[in-house]
């Protein structure tokens, strides 16, 4: 059983989603957004840090997955997004959580099957995968999709290790994955 916290970073709205993975089963635990007022950037970053820390305290996740920064048309927006993302990562690292990063395109590909899926498609598929009666709000759905992507990555990686031809190879692959996952050094890009 693994609890995964997914974060969709933003300087004004940061989405979060928490799921529990037990074998092949994914269970929804909670989601929402951290909204910051139109304060100055340092105050917004402080609110993001406090919000992520509070979520970690409430749900006690084992792993932290976050969307990578994409290149925005506006460099100032990209810098603010990077700062919000860094703030969320610091909150996770301060609680000794391993951090995993995923490209937005990979998240959409994993959850929807199309790397260029729109927000509505992500919301629909997240609700379907987690058997939710209502669609989560867009930023929370993105965060849940990031957590689902990480759960899928773990399951696939362990399947690869289990399908190795020899016990020695299985042990080496399993040890490698445990090391990578415990240190949070796993990055996937598409």
Curated annotation (Swiss-Prot):
Mg(2+) 2 binds at residue 67. Its EC number is 3.1.21.10. It is found in: Cytoplasm. It is an enzyme of class 3 (hydrolase). Its cofactor is Mg(2+). The active site is at residues 8, 67, 139. It catalyses: Endonucleolytic cleavage at a junction such as a reciprocal single-stranded crossover between two homologous DNA duplexes (Holliday junction). SUPFAM superfamilies: Ribonuclease H-like. One of its GO terms (cellular component) is cytoplasm. One of its GO terms (biological process) is DNA repair. InterPro entries: RNaseH-like_sf, RNaseH_sf, X-over_junc_endoDNase_Mg_BS, X-over_junc_endoDNase_RuvC. Mg(2+) 1 binds at residues 8, 139. Keywords: Cytoplasm, DNA damage, DNA recombination, DNA repair, DNA-binding, Endonuclease, Hydrolase, Magnesium, Metal-binding, Nuclease. Binds 2 Mg(2+) ion per subunit. One of its GO terms (molecular function) is magnesium ion binding. Homodimer which binds Holliday junction (HJ) DNA. The HJ becomes 2-fold symmetrical on binding to RuvC with unstacked arms; it has a different conformation from HJ DNA in complex with RuvA. In the full resolvosome a probable DNA-RuvA(4)-RuvB(12)-RuvC(2) complex forms which resolves the HJ. Belongs to the RuvC family. NCBIfam families: PRK00039.2-1 (NF000711), ruvC (TIGR00228). The RuvA-RuvB-RuvC complex processes Holliday junction (HJ) DNA during genetic recombination and DNA repair. Endonuclease that resolves HJ intermediates. Cleaves cruciform DNA by making single-stranded nicks across the HJ at symmetrical positions within the homologous arms, yielding a 5'-phosphate and a 3'-hydroxyl group; requires a central core of homology in the junction. The consensus cleavage sequence is 5'-(A/T)TT(C/G)-3'. Cleavage occurs on the 3'-side of the TT dinucleotide at the point of strand exchange. This is Crossover junction endodeoxyribonuclease RuvC.
